[in-house]
């Protein structure tokens, strides 16, 4: 009798649960949003006179745009490094989560994926808090400026990463209460 109970337990732990699948979708969305945020040309805009991304800063002088690299400023390099580091960890977590679907014993991958996602969230939050603080401190614009969709995509990626981490932390033994 004990052997049949342990056999049932083994079958139950190898079934893919919907929350883990939703968690994997959250990780994929976070990865897509991170790619969009890093490649976005619009992190800060100012009345069609100024654009700032993670890679370049462009100012409009009369009818001509003058662009400079932002990789000369230490805070912009730090922001880029934090976001790329977080995106790399999210990519690894996604690959581990995807591989865990293909492997029979999935439960051993849940905790590492959750830990990686929480680490990525910490890195990205640090970068996303650093960016506006240092921008306001160092860049003086005489016109109205706003943080644009690239910055918003990065926050979206961070939120989806956090959601995926929470879903991967949920204990699969308690799922029968929900179904």
Curated annotation (Swiss-Prot):
Residues that span the membrane, as ranges: 21-41, 81-101, 113-133, 150-170
- Provide the alphabetized UniProt keywords: Cell junction, Membrane, Transmembrane, Transmembrane helix
Q: Which GO terms describe its cellular component?
A: adherens junction; membrane
Q: Which InterPro entries does the record cross-reference, listed alphabetically?
A: P53_induced (IPR015664)
Q: Where's it mainly located?
A: membrane
The way it spans or sits in the membrane comes to:
Multi-pass membrane protein
Q: Where in the cell is it found?
A: Membrane; Cell junction, Adherens junction
Q: What does this protein do?
A: Regulates cell junction organization in epithelial cells. May play a role in the transition from adherens junction to tight junction assembly.
Protein family according to the UniProt entry:
Belongs to the TMEM47 family.
Protein name, UniProt field: Transmembrane protein 47
List the source organism: Xenopus tropicalis (Western clawed frog)
């Amino acid at each position: 009798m004990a052997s049949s109970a342990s056999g049932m337990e083994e079958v139950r732990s190898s079934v893919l649960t919907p929350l883990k699948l939703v968690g994997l979708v959250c990780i994929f969305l976070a990865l897509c949003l991170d790619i969009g945020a890093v490649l976005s040309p619009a992190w800060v805009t100012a009345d069609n006179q100024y654009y700032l991304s993670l890679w370049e800063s462009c100012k409009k002088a009369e009818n001509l745009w003058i662009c400079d690299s932002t990789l000369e400023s230490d805070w912009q390099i730090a922001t880029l490094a934090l976001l790329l580091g977080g995106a790399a960890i999210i990519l690894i977590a996604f690959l581990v989560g995807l591989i865990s679907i293909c492997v029979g014993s999935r439960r051993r991958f849940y905790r590492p994926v959750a830990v990686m996602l929480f680490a990525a969230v910490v890195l990205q939050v640090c970068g996303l808090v650093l960016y506006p603080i240092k921008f306001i401190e160092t860049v003086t614009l005489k016109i109205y400026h706003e943080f644009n969709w690239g910055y918003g995509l990065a926050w979206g990626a961070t939120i989806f990463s956090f959601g995926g981490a929470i879903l991967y932390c949920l204990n699969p033994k308690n799922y029968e209460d929900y179904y």
